[in-house]
Amino acid sequence: MLKDQNLDIERKQDHIEINLTKNVESTLKSGFESIHFIHNALPEINYDSVNTTTTFLGKSLQAPILISSMTGGTTRARDINYRLAQVAQKAGIAMGLGSMRVLLTEPDTIKTFAVRHIAPDIPLLANIGAVQLNYGVTPKECQYLVDAIKADALILHLNVLQELTQPEGNRNWEKLLPKIREVVNYLSIPVIVKEVGYGLSKKVAESLIDAGVKVLDIAGSGGTSWSQVEAYRATNSLQNRIASSFINWGIPTLDSLKMVREVSKDIPIITSGGFKSGIDGAKAIRIGANIFGLAGQFLKAADTSESLLSEEIQLIIEQLKITMLCTGSRTLKDLAKAEIRL
């Protein structure tokens, strides 16, 4: 067990370092580069009246932005999460924590995840890999993770390709959907199911909604490729070649968003995967997302300083607001109907 615990910590350290220092971008595009807003030269709106507020998980957000799940479990991760939480609280945006599996075996790592005292008002999301339900993690333990950080929802992330390109990855993905349903029924808060960068298909979305999942985070291709991250972690040539061969795998974010929104007009959708700006986020809102998420650029900023992270988030918000004004959109509901060309 101790060896497994140490491996969890080592893997988390590797993931931070690789994401900060290596090119791990998918060779696929998100698809949003094909969408263009029709510029409104006479919007008849005061910039100060542009309203980016929304609600998520029963809480108010100043902008429809999620700091997507990244890290936890290490000293460096603690510092990153504290900065993320501080800035998220000030900006009024949501935040996800990295995978919390290590907390089930090493209770002392709670200090790297527990940020509610820093961010008392924002939606905060606990997180664990869904496949862990096939390896002994119980609904009761999922509730423990939620309670430990006073979370508003639990993310069950689907990372099948990442696991299969990890030498120590989990291989058994059989009969997982019934276990997800059990967690949904057991927990006192909503369950979010999230891909990690390869997209959710229409069929998978239908299955998850039928199981009672309340929010979907489609996390399509176009951003970080976790198989490429694992390629850098490979300890031999074969592992590296296997992982590297999936650099262009997945459903582009735009395609995944369209598929999932076709399944349900009502389910809240978080869209992430390849977003670099508030303009990209605005496009996602226009196509059917409720919230858009970013990770990579926030990670790099948070590893440096709170001030740099704050500037990065303010940049995204200002880009979103300017896009709204230049499309004649006073509110996010207006933006969802803005004129576009494909």
Swiss-Prot record:
Gene Ontology CC, one term: cytoplasm
Residues given in the record as substrate binding sites: 11-12, 99-101, 162
Keywords associated with the record: Cytoplasm, Flavoprotein, FMN, Isomerase, Isoprene biosynthesis, Magnesium, Metal-binding, NADP
Complex formation: Homooctamer. Dimer of tetramers.
Known role: Involved in the biosynthesis of isoprenoids. Catalyzes the 1,3-allylic rearrangement of the homoallylic substrate isopentenyl (IPP) to its allylic isomer, dimethylallyl diphosphate (DMAPP).
NCBIfam families the UniProt entry points to: IPP_isom_2
Name under which the protein is recorded: Isopentenyl-diphosphate delta-isomerase
Organism: Rickettsia conorii (strain ATCC VR-613 / Malish 7)
Encoding gene per record: fni
